[in-house]
A protein has these predicted regions:
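N-terminal Lys/Arg-rich, disordered targeting/topogenic segments
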Residues: 1-27
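A subset of signal/propeptide-processing and intrinsically disordered low-complexity segments
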Residues: 13-14, 36, 96
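Hydrophobic single-pass membrane-insertion segments
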Residues: 36-52, 327
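Core hydrophobic alpha-helical transmembrane segments of single-pass membrane proteins
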Residues: 26-36
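Domain-terminus/edge residues, biased toward the C-terminal soluble/receptor-binding domains
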Residues: 22-26, 39, 205-206, 220-329
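Active-site-adjacent loops and short helices of periplasmic peptidoglycan-processing enzymes
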Residues: 7, 18, 45-226, 233-239
Length: 329
């Protein structure tokens, strides 16, 4: 197998197998060359730090900067952010955690990101994408008794009430209303779950499975943090989706009687620590889950995924504080 094809493998270098040892000598020579070149530009200490990730990949079989990194990306690492290896990796409570750069998809921190975990209401990001593709935001939806009977009281809806699609979408993404999610799914002209699972297939989210639009524990909705990273990257240009996930509160009105429904975000970190937008999730089996986009520098935004956590907001603060100290922006 050519070296370029090896480095472009969709699996981490540690999973490539015996072939990585065949090319270790070549890769190690490349490490030395890159270190020397970088040394002339940024000093010996910095060049050694810059060469470490590639050296680890070549010798130890550690993951490359991106799971599908090209040889050009590996041999020409971005100047910023620069890792300060004097700052040790954070100790997070979550079973799974991930921070990545939205601009170049570079993974900055990872913990068990390829093991499928239950995602709870993070499912509603996929449901939101399906709603935006299949329903007119200005169309009307009347809540059925079945929709209102869905577990949870978020939104404080009654059967027979009518709302615009955009308002139910707001309730689903701001206050994580299960009633709103089910009502939107029922109103769609095509099966929402079929659309979601086709989208999963199209995006290549190989370890993601969705069986309900809400994410409740009665169905096995699971994904890996790596798949959720790819979902965030794909959905980041859906401004309405992320605008709603960035609202700390909202008021929607029932169409017939103009009855107001006050909504308050479940995302308690909005506007703090640079957090711009995000979605929370919780079930007994999934524990606390969270995805977010946050501002780390004036022109730098990072994505974050937390799964299987007893305290997602503490984990998030730990990771954001670490990212500020561990990288030069």
């Amino acid at each position: 197998m050519p070296l370029k094809k090896l480095l472009q493998s969709p699996r981490p270098a540690s999973n490539v197998g015996e072939e990585v040892f065949f090319y270790a000598g070549t890769a190690l020579g490349t490490v030395v060359f890159v270190a020397l070149v970088l040394g002339t530009q940024m000093g010996l200490a910095q060049s050694r730090a810059a060469a470490l990730p590639l050296q680890a990949a070549a010798i130890l079989g550690a993951p490359l900067p991106r799971e599908s990194a090209s040889i050009e990306a590996v041999l020409t690492p971005p100047l910023y952010p620069q890792r300060d290896f004097g700052v040790v990796e954070p100790n997070v409570l979550a079973g799974t955690a991930l921070i990545f750069n939205l601009a170049d998809e570079r993974i900055l921190f990872e913990k068990d990101i390829h093991t499928p975990k239950k995602i709870a209401s993070l499912t509603k990001i996929l449901t939101g994408l399906a709603v935006l593709e299949n329903l007119n935001l200005n169309s009307k939806v009347t809540l059925t008794p079945e929709a209102v009977a869905t577990f949870g009281q978020a939104g404080n809806f009654d059967a027979g009430e009518t709302f615009l699609v955009r308002d139910l979408l707001t309730a689903m993404l701001v206050q994580s209303s299960n009633d709103a999610a089910q009502a939107l799914a029922d109103a769609a002209p095509q099966n929402i779950l079929d659309f979601i699972n086709k989208l999963i297939l199209d995006l290549g989210l190989e370890k993601t499975s969705i069986a309900t639009v809400t994410g409740l524990d009665d169905a096995d909705n699971h994904a890996t943090a790596f798949d959720l990273m790819r979902l965030i990257l794909y959905s980041s240009d859906q401004r309405e989706l992320w605008r709603l996930m960035g609202l700390p509160q909202a008021t929607i009105y029932e169409v017939k009687n103009q009855t107001p429904h006050e909504l308050f975000s479940t995302n308690k970190l909005l506007g703090k620590f640079g957090v711009i937008a995000g979605k929370t999730g919780f079930t007994t089996e999934a524990k606390e889950t969270y995805v977010a986009i946050f501002q780390i520098a004036p022109d730098q935004r990072l994505g974050l995924v937390i799964l299987d956590s007893p305290d997602r907001f503490t984990d998030t603060q730990t990771l954001i504080n670490w990212a500020n100290r561990a990288y030069q922006w």
